[in-house]
C-alpha cells in the first residue's frame, strides 16, 4: 500500500507550443487549447476526488495559469502556492524563439534531436544580441539570482541539477510530513523529478514524453520510491495522442 501520493501536471499548450517554437524561459502564456487542457486536467482531478495541501510551481505564467485553472476546477484556489525559478523550463539558449520544424529543416532532424534529447549536450548559448536576451536576462523576477544561477543555456542534465535542490530541500519534507503535494511545472523540470523518483537512466529519461495538461500520479512507499508506474488521469486515447504530439516536436515538416 502506498505511503504517499504525488501529483504532477505539465502546463497546457502555450502560444509558443502552438507555433512549435522553443519556449525556454520566454514567458509565453497558454493558448486557448492549453487553457482547455488545464481545465480538463482539473476536472480529472475533481472527478477522482483529489485534495491537496500545498502546490509548487515555476515563475512562468503558462504554468502558473495552468495551476490556477486546475485549482479553480477542484475548488481549492485557497491553497498555498510556492513559486520557484528552479522549476522553470529548460533554458534553450540561442534556440529560444526558433520554430522547431524550421530549425530541423535547416540543421537536420538529427542535430535538433541532439539539442533536444541529449542528456548532457547543451544548445548554443543565448548571446547578448539575441532578440530575447534582455527580455529574459533582465527580467526582475530573476533579479536575486547570482551570475552562476542565471543560465544562458541548459542541457537536461543542467536543468535537473538546478531542480533537485528544491526537490530535496522543499518538496521531500512536505511529502514526508504527510502533505498532499501538487507540482505544476514544465516538461524538462518534471522529467528531472521523474528521473530522480524512478531512478531512470539518462537514456530512458530522454525518451520520456510527458503529455500537456494531464495529471500524473505517483504512488510512493515510505522511501519515496514508486510502488507502480506513473499513472495518467485521462482516457487512454487522449493520453496517447498528447504523448505523440510531444514526441513529434522537433521534426521537419514533410
From Swiss-Prot:
Stated family: Belongs to the phosphoglycerate mutase family. BPG-dependent PGAM subfamily.
Highest taxon, organism lineage: Eukaryota
This protein's UniProt keywords: Acetylation, Glycolysis, Hydrolase, Isomerase, Phosphoprotein
Gene Ontology cellular-component terms listed: extracellular exosome; sperm principal piece
Lipid metabolism found in the keyword field: no
A GO BP entry: positive regulation of flagellated sperm motility
SUPFAM superfamilies given in the database record: Phosphoglycerate mutase-like
Residue(s) carrying N6-acetyllysine: 106, 251, 253-254
Top enzyme class: isomerase
A family per Pfam: His_Phos_1
Gene3D superfamilies: Phosphoglycerate mutase-like
Source organism: Homo sapiens
Modified residues (Phosphoserine): 14, 23, 31, 118
Binding site for substrate: 10-17, 23-24, 62, 89-92, 100, 116-117, 187-188
Reactions listed under catalytic activity: (2R)-2-phosphoglycerate = (2R)-3-phosphoglycerate; (2R)-3-phospho-glyceroyl phosphate = (2R)-2,3-bisphosphoglycerate + H(+)
The protein's name: Probable phosphoglycerate mutase 4
InterPro entries cross-referenced by the UniProt entry: His_Pase_superF_clade-1, His_PPase_superfam, PG/BPGM_mutase_AS, Phosphogly_mut1
EC numbers, comma separated: 5.4.2.11, 5.4.2.4
HAMAP family in the cross-refs: PGAM_GpmA (MF_01039)
Modified residues (Phosphotyrosine): 26
Lineage of source species: Eukaryota, Metazoa, Chordata, Craniata, Vertebrata
Active site (record annotation): 11, 89
